[in-house]
């Protein structure tokens, strides 16, 4: 799937298979994104899905309202379609 990250430095796109976490693939592509636990139990890597769909069933931090509003934790989020995610969203939670 094509993943586009809307970062403070501009938009960056890369291919990410449906079985790879978006944060891991972004790092392989040389992108520096915020993270801390890498286990879906904090909010350092939070992003917001602008278009497309994801699977973040491995996360345990965001509540249903935050997930329903489109927020995700990029360290435990898989793409399930082409997706655009705004990064650096921890302060919005």
From Swiss-Prot:
Subcellular location per the Swiss-Prot or TrEMBL entry: Plastid, Chloroplast
Keyword Transmembrane helix (UniProt): no
Pfam families: Fer2
Cofactor: [2Fe-2S] cluster
Top-rank taxon, per record: Eukaryota
Domain 2Fe-2S ferredoxin-type, residue spans: 1-91
GO terms (BP aspect): electron transport chain
Main location: plastid
InterPro entries found in the cross-reference section: 2Fe-2S_ferredoxin-like_sf, 2Fe-2S_ferredoxin-type, 2Fe2S_fd_BS, Beta-grasp_dom_sf, Fd_pln
GO molecular function: 2 iron, 2 sulfur cluster binding; electron transfer activity; metal ion binding
Alphabetical UniProt keywords: 2Fe-2S, Chloroplast, Electron transport, Iron, Iron-sulfur, Metal-binding, Plastid, Transport
GO cellular-component term (any): chloroplast
Binding of [2Fe-2S] cluster, residues: 37, 42, 45, 75
Cofactor notes: Binds 1 [2Fe-2S] cluster.
UniProt keyword NAD present: no
Family membership noted in the UniProt record: Belongs to the 2Fe2S plant-type ferredoxin family.
Free-text function comment from the UniProt entry: Ferredoxins are iron-sulfur proteins that transfer electrons in a wide variety of metabolic reactions.
Protein name as it appears in the record: Ferredoxin
Originating species: Peridinium bipes (Dinoflagellate)
């Amino acid at each position: 799937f094509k993943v586009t990250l809307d970062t403070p430095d501009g938009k960056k796109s890369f291919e990410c298979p449906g079985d790879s976490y978006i944060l891991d693939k972004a790092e392989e592509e040389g992108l520096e994104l915020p993270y801390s636990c890498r286990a879906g139990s904090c909010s350092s890597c939070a992003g917001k899905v602008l278009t497309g769909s994801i699977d973040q069933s491995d996360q345990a931090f965001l509540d249903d309202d935050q997930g329903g509003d489109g927020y995700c934790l990029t360290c435990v989020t898989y793409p399930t379609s082409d997706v655009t995610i705004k990064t650096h969203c921890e302060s919005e939670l």
